[in-house]
Structure formats: C-alpha cells, structure tokens
C-alpha cells in the first residue's frame, strides 16, 4: 500500500527496495532506494523530463522521424517513461521492456496509465538473458538503461553483450546506451566495447561530464548504417538545454587508450557471472504470482 506524506510523495515497497513517487503537479518522479529513476508527465507523457531521454529521442528521430512506427526493446524498465513517450508519439509501435524486479514490473501499471501489450509489454528477467533469447533482426532500436546502485551491471557493458545487441537489431537499427561517466565510471570503456560490432558511434553529453569534471550521463549512439550526425546535431540544438555530439576524430581522441569490457571466461560450471542468470517471465505470469 502507498502512504502519502506531507510533501506530496507516496511510498511503495518492491522486491529491490523502496520506491518513492514524488509529485510536482502532473509530473511524477520515481526514486528507487533514494536514487532518481524515472519521471513521467502524466498530463502529456510525450514530454520527457530527463535530459538523456531527450537525447535518446533526438537520436531516434534523426533516423526514424516520428510518427514512424518502430519496434523497440528497452533493457531496464523502471516506470517505463521512455517507452510510454514513444508509444504516445508513435502510435502503432511495439515496445518490449525488461525489468529485473518482479514487484516493480507489476506495480508500475497500477501507478501509471501505461499502454497494454502489444503496444507495451513488460517482461521480468535479466536484461541480457532476455535479449539473448530474441530472434535475429527483431528490433529497430534497443535502449539499454540499466543501473544497480548507480553502476551499469558488468555483464551489460561487455563486447559479448554488444555482439548480442547487434544480432538482435535490424541492419539499419540503433543501439542507444545510457552510460554513467565520472565518479569512478568511465563511459569511454563502454564505447571501446562497441567498436568491433558497430561501425558508426557517437556520444551525447554535457561538455563538463565529457571532461570528467563531474559525474553525469553520456548517451552513446551505435549503428551500422550511415548515421545523420548533422540532423542529430540540429535536433539537439532545439532542446531546452542544448547538448554536444562527439564523433569521428574527436570521439577517437576522447576514447584513446580506453580498454573494452570483456566477459569472464566460461567455467566448467557453466556460463560466467557476466552472462547473468536467465530468469524471465511474462507480466501476466508475474501478476498471477502476486495475486
């Protein structure tokens, strides 16, 4: 049950901890164990509050202009703010979100007016295990937005993970990764992990974050088709807080010396820790389990 506070917040308990939904008018910001996780504008879900989600929207629009239909895989569900926005902006699209927390995956439909399947399906499981179960060339875009205590899980940033993402993407598809940088995290190593699988790479970030002056988000865009950098740059300049694209020689210079993340060698007991455990179920099964 939710319990309201004088600040206009409500609190819920899920498998991974406590969720606070903090309301500011129609905007609901979701915190998981005190860490800002999602924000939904309930009056107009197409409005994206988080800057990195605005960057992801620009990156997608540069290749697949709205309202073009897409099929998207979202690794990391939380409150499904980005799938909801894209479902609103692109009617007829199909979104699959993967959330590792069964309680959270089921509860977000009670908290927010999310589209039902097939517009938006929510699957419970490990992001990599679910992606590895997908057929080749299934998606136009894959979004990786997964964090555990402020860090991207190790098995979701390796060369092997990038290889699986390329397999599941269509030939003209986009791989969008929300990376942490600064404060002990290095997005440049994530870019290095993508190089063997994706020929077109760029990053979007605040210049201060790029210089490691402060911790922040870096959105990495990966593709194997000619990516319209100029169009992306034009769209980013229209945002309330314009962002900078780093690509080509500038990206090579920024990432110089960065070493890719590798999966551990498989042991005789089976797949290494970085692969993650396959623990998936449909949202319907998850709902029945909670009933």
For each feature predicted by the language model, list its residue ranges.
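A generic structural signal for alpha->beta connector loops
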Residues: 18, 92-94, 117-119, 172, ...
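A short, flexible beta-alpha/helix-coil linker loop
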Residues: 35-39, 147-150, 175
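C-terminal substrate-binding/active-site "lid" region of AdoMet-derived donor-dependent transferases
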Residues: 162-229
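S-adenosyl-L-methionine
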Residues: 31-32
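Residue-level preference for alpha-helix termini and adjacent loops
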Residues: 39, 111-113, 151, 155, ...
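SAM/dcSAM-binding transferase cores
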Residues: 2-23, 37-45, 62, 211-291
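The AdoMet/dcAdoMet-binding core of the Class I SAM-like
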Residues: 12, 43-167, 184-185, 291
């Amino acid at each position: 049950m939710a319990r309201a506070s004088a600040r206009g917040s409500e609190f819920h308990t899920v498998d991974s901890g406590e969720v606070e939904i903090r309301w500011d008018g129609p905007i609901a910001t979701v915190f998981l164990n005190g860490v800002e996780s999602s924000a939904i504008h309930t009056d107009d879900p197409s409005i994206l509050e988080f800057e990195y989600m605005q960057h992801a929207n620009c990156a997608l629009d540069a290749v697949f202009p709205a309202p073009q239909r897409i099929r998207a895989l979202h690794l990391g569900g939380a409150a499904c703010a980005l799938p909801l926005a894209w479902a609103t902006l692109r009617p007829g699209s199909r979104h699959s979100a993967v959330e590792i927390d069964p309680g959270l995956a089921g509860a977000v439909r009670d908290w927010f007016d999310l589209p039902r399947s097939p517009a938006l399906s929510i699957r419970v499981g490990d992001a990599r295990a679910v992606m590895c179960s997908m057929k080749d060339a299934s998606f136009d875009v894959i979004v990786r937005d997964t964090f555990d205590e402020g860090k991207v899980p190790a098995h979701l940033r390796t060369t092997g993970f990038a290889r699986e993402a390329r397999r599941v993407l269509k030939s003209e598809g986009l791989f969008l990764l929300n990376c942490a940088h600064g404060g002990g995290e290095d997005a440049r190593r994530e870019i290095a992990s993508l190089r063997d699988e994706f020929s077109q790479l760029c990053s979007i970030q605040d210049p201060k974050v790029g210089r490691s002056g402060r911790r922040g988000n870096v959105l990495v865009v990966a593709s194997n088709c000619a990516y319209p950098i100029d169009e992306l740059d034009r769209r980013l300049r229209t945002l309330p807080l314009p962002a900078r694209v780093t690509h080509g020689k500038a990206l090579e210079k920024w990432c110089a010396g960065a070493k890719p993340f590798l999966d551990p060698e498989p042991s005789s007991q089976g797949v290494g820790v970085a692969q993650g455990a396959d623990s998936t179920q449909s949202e319907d099964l998850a709902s029945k389990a909670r009933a």
